[in-house]
Each structure stands twice: as C-alpha cells, then as structure tokens.
Amino acid sequence: MPISMTRRQMLMNTGAVAAGLTLGRATARAEWIASSTLPLDEEKVKVRARLHNNENPFGPSEKARRAMTDAFNEGCRYPGGQNKKLEELIAKKEGLPADQVILGAGSGEILRMAAMAYGPQGGELLTAHPTYEGLESAARTIGAFVHRVPLNKNFEHDLDAMDRRTTQAVRLVFVCNPNNPTGTIVPGDRLRTFCKEVSKRSIVLVDEAYHDYVDAPQYSSMIDLAREGHNVIISRTFSKIHGMAGLRVGYGFARSDIVARLRQFRNQINVLGLAAATASYQDPEFQGLSRKRNAEARSYLYKVLDELRYRYIPSHANFVFFHLGKDAQAQAFRDAMEKRGILVGRVFQPYTEWARVSTGTMDEMKIFATALREVTSQGLTAAKKQAEPEN
C-alpha cells in the first residue's frame, strides 16, 4: 500500500530526489517538453486560429464574468470561504459529503497532487501511452518510475494489459477517459470492473476532463466508485465545457482520507477563479450551449476531413485525432499550419503521422479548413481514404 509523506517532507526531499534522477527519466522528461506547445513570438506569427490546447473559445459565461467583477473587492483576501462554498455546491449536486471533494488550480493540479502523494521515494505509477502527460510529467520530476502501456489497435486503453502490469509495487494507475489525444472512451461497465479490481492493489485515478462532452450511451462516470469508498480518484476541470482554461480551477472526488492526503500538496486558487467557477457550475444553459457549439464544430471538421479523404478517429471530446498519411510527419504539418497562423496540437509519440486539432469557433474551423485544403494540395501531407478503427 502507498507510503505516507507530508508536504514539508516532500519539499525537503525534492532536491535530493531530483539530483538522483536517472538519464532515462531525464530523457523522457525532455521528450515531453520538446513535444509540448511552447510559447510563440506572436510578433512574428500572427495567430488566426488557436486549435492546439483543446480550449472552449465561448467561455467564460456571462454569469461567470459578472461573478468575477463582483469578486474584485475580495482580491485583497486569501480564499477560504469561497473554497468551502464551491466544494459544498459540487458535493450536493454529485451526492457525496463535502470532505470527498477537492479543488485544485485546474485538474492538472489534482494530477500533480496525486503524483506528489503517491510517487516519491521510488514510487511506481502506470499510465496508457499516449495519453495526457500531466501526471507523468509531475511524477518524473520527483523521481517516480512511470510504466507506459501502449493503446490497443483501436486507439483505446488496453485495460487487460494495464491490469497485468499493475503489480503491488505500482502505487497509482492513471486512466484518461475520454482519452487525450485520441478522443476514445472506455465503456463504463468495462472501466468500472477494471477500477474495482485494480483498486485492490493500487489507487486508480480517472481523469474525466472531457466528461461533459460525452453523449455516448456506453459511457459513464466513475464517481460512484468514489462514493462507495474504493481506492479511486476522479478529476474534472472548469477549463473545458465551462471555458475557463485561463482561470485554473479544477476539482476531484475521492474517499475522505485520500482527499486529506492530497490536500497536503494543494496550492490556493485565486478568488476570481472561484467566483467564476461557482457561477458557471450553476449555469446549465451555458454548458448546454458549449456542448452544442462543440458538436457543430466537430461535425464540420468531420466533413472537411471526409472531403479530403483523411482517416480520423470519431471523438468524444472537443478535438479530433486524424491520420496525415503514410510517411507524413506531424511536426512538418504543425510547422506548415503555423506559417498560416493556425496552431494545432503537439506531436504525440509514437503516432508521428497523426495530428490533433481542437474544435474552435466556426470562423476558426473555416480558416483551418482553407489551410488544410491548401496544405493537402501542395503535397505536404498524404491524404488517405477515411477508415474508422476496427470494432
């Protein structure tokens, strides 16, 4: 079972652990940084469409903006009561005690807290590959060893392989559902069975950042496992459906003792973000509008990819992963699009022939479509007939 370590001990040990990182770990960290989106010199690159970070361009909602304006007078105070108010609001809606809810500066901080709680002193973590790298990146900086399990032939989590790789030494197992960058989901019944079994040996962290976009009947949240007291953590965010990526507010669910352990490593959330999140959480109309506009943009993107005969994976999120063609290179495609003022997703190893593009406003999608037609016609990528993953 995972060891216990306080935040103070963690900070004291971090320097020593970091100094002892192996070359392999450092190389893996460098690989992730090199493939990530780095700041651009926007004086040299005139950005016309931001389709690289899976953002929701329609937020924050009007109610969230008004709440932030009203909260300016509290900017001189540390957050306290605002944290509790939002935690209680979320707990009431989800049907669990407030001590089973934790807030963070985006769901990325929930993942970082989990890495710091379960990864130090040579801890082993397990994740699919490729998937969202936030947990792996945080874990490697403190010297944890991360096992990567490749996706299956349908670009989905290989749960059987992940189960086999979860030994007693593995302290934390990470599942991103829907998965980033592929947009695929693990059906609820299969994931629930996996979580119940694997959580007997390890903590299972299910990242549900794109939960609000999914309308597939076979999908379901794993929050019921947190309610029932399993060794399961659920993370969600206000960055996606709520359109608040720049405000950095996320939240999670777990058994109360797990939440208490995570809280040792939590930083504060700013009062404006808390005010906006509290208002947006109670604004189903805006959430529905975001969902509708995302579906429209995604449908438009599918039509463009069909027209140009690109193969893509049907997505359950606000981005689409598509195949550029045999021997095409995602980095070359990124460069070609950037020259046209369009930002697309980073390269995801080992799928170097694939590109991820986020949905945006309809104007942004049309700008992307025009550029994609141009890039394709110039032979910078090899267009291939669309084919869905095997069932």
Whereabouts are the PLM-identified features?
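Phosphate-binding glycine-rich loop
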Residues: 75, 85-124, 142
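PLP-dependent aminotransferase-like
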Residues: 117-175
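PLP-dependent aminotransferase class I/II
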Residues: 231-313
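PLP-dependent enzyme catalytic core of the Aspartate aminotransferase-like
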Residues: 336-340, 348-391
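Conserved PLP-binding catalytic core of the aspartate aminotransferase-like
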Residues: 151-153, 295, 307-340
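N-terminal "arm"/small-domain region of PLP-dependent enzymes with the aminotransferase-like
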Residues: 17-77
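Active-site pre-lysine segment of PLP-dependent enzymes
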Residues: 159-168, 181-204, 208-239
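N-terminal secretory signal peptides and thylakoid transit peptides that target proteins
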Residues: 1-18
